[in-house]
Amino acid sequence: MKIDYLTLFPEMFEGVLNHSILKRAQDKGIINVNTINFRDYSINKHNQVDDYPFGGGQGMVLKPEPVFNAMEDINRNEHTRVILMCPQGRPFTQEIAQELSEAKHIVFICGHYEGYDERIRKHLVTDEISMGDYVLTGGELPAMTMTDAIVRLIPGVLGNQASHQDDSFSDGLLEFPQYTRPREYKNMSVPEVLLSGNHAHIDQWRHEQKLIRTYEKRPDLLEQYPLTEKDREILETYKKKLKND
């Protein structure tokens, strides 16, 4: 996968891209990343990339020329996903991360200031993505977050490709509780079922815990999850237990 970042602050990406999973993915040749400072494509002698909005208003707006010019230097085709990081976009989810992990080329447009000239949005962008109902100073941090979520799903990136299959949201539920050694710590014990060696019982316990944890922390996710009759029984039993405690 090729990943290009159009940004005014390419140095922001150095720490994230040069460590951990993203660095290993580059070392393996699975991803090829490139940061492009679109200030270098300004047609203004002062390298200006923003201007006041027509019609008045607060803040500055990114000019179209630097972004369009930078995009012309990127070798892309009709399959390239050009992502605009903006609060108006569709909320980023694990499902979108999985979808984008199958792309061959992604371009992130990371803006600053008040916003973008609308012509950038209309004529260059294939996807508008939001990280949530809040506003950040620029698109760099969301682009880094998305990159991490996307790249770890590409085959060959993780040491054990099945590692992400139990992650929260991978099947629509939150992840089950995890334990490691020591078995006892400050009078807190690991659940006996995890020490039993009975993998069928362990799988059942983990699924029950995923249902319960999702009900406790993100009940909205259960509205979309295809609950079986057994799942409903598990949740009803848990609800009754809560009432009796």
Swiss-Prot record:
Coiled coil: none annotated. Its EC number is 2.1.1.228. SUPFAM superfamilies: alpha/beta knot. Pfam families: tRNA_m1G_MT. It is found in: Cytoplasm. InterPro entries: Alpha/beta_knot_MTases, tRNA_m1G_MeTrfase_C_sf, tRNA_m1G_MeTrfase_TrmD, tRNA_m1G_MTases_N, tRNA_MeTrfase_TRMD/TRM10. Keywords: Cytoplasm, Methyltransferase, S-adenosyl-L-methionine, Transferase, tRNA processing. It catalyses: guanosine(37) in tRNA + S-adenosyl-L-methionine = N(1)-methylguanosine(37) in tRNA + S-adenosyl-L-homocysteine + H(+). GO terms for cellular component: cytosol. Its main location: cytoplasm. One of its GO terms (biological process) is tRNA N1-guanine methylation. S-adenosyl-L-methionine binds at residues 111, 131-136. GO terms for molecular function: tRNA (guanine(37)-N1)-methyltransferase activity. Homodimer. Specifically methylates guanosine-37 in various tRNAs. NCBIfam families: PRK00026.1, trmD. Belongs to the RNA methyltransferase TrmD family. PANTHER family: TRNA (GUANINE-N(1)-)-METHYLTRANSFERASE (PTHR46417:SF1). This is tRNA (guanine-N(1)-)-methyltransferase. It comes from Staphylococcus epidermidis (strain ATCC 35984 / DSM 28319 / BCRC 17069 / CCUG 31568 / BM 3577 / RP62A). The lineage of its organism: Bacteria, Bacillati, Bacillota, Bacilli, Bacillales.
